[in-house]
């Protein structure tokens, strides 16, 4: 009796949730950096389209090596898989027309929610006015 078992292996994408959790973890550990100018060679008037071979920013493994240094000198330099940023995000809690944020003052929030619509998060730690609304309706109930 000859039975044949065939196994096929293929790559598959991780679940959306696991990708989101991974990115959120990296986001929470992101490092603020400044760009070092040392080690960059070539004509700075060429703009972004200059020949990469002249810029001196290739690493030994053929990848691009960014010249990032920690914004705070007490912090360690970011690794090749770390998320980095140059500027802090604007404070979305306060109105800032230049950044295009309206702030959260005067917005409705849900006092019982722990999500983004919850008062604790939306009001940015400030106090908030509570109100209760009662609506009386005819229900056409039968007993």
Swiss-Prot record:
A single GO molecular function term of this UniProt record: cytokine activity
Lipid-substituted positions (O-palmitoleoyl serine): 1
Membrane-spanning segments: none
Disordered: annotated segments: 38-81
Residues of this chain annotated as glycosylated in UniProt: 110-111
Chief localisation class: secreted
Swiss-Prot/TrEMBL GO biological process terms: canonical Wnt signaling pathway; cell fate commitment; neuron differentiation
InterPro entries: Wnt (IPR005817), Wnt_C (IPR043158)
Pfam families with a match to the protein in the record: wnt
Compositional bias annotation for Polar residues: 64-75
PTM comment text: Palmitoleoylation is required for efficient binding to frizzled receptors. Palmitoleoylation is necessary for proper trafficking to cell surface. Depalmitoleoylated by NOTUM, leading to inhibit Wnt signaling pathway.
Location of the protein in the cell: Secreted, Extracellular space, Extracellular matrix; Secreted
Coiled-coil annotated spans: none
Basic and acidic residues: bias regions: 46-60
Annotated keywords: Developmental protein, Disulfide bond, Extracellular matrix, Glycoprotein, Lipoprotein, Secreted, Wnt signaling pathway
Family to which the UniProt record says this protein belongs: Belongs to the Wnt family.
Function: Ligand for members of the frizzled family of seven transmembrane receptors. Probable developmental protein.
Protein name as annotated: Protein Wnt-1
Native species: Evasterias troschelii
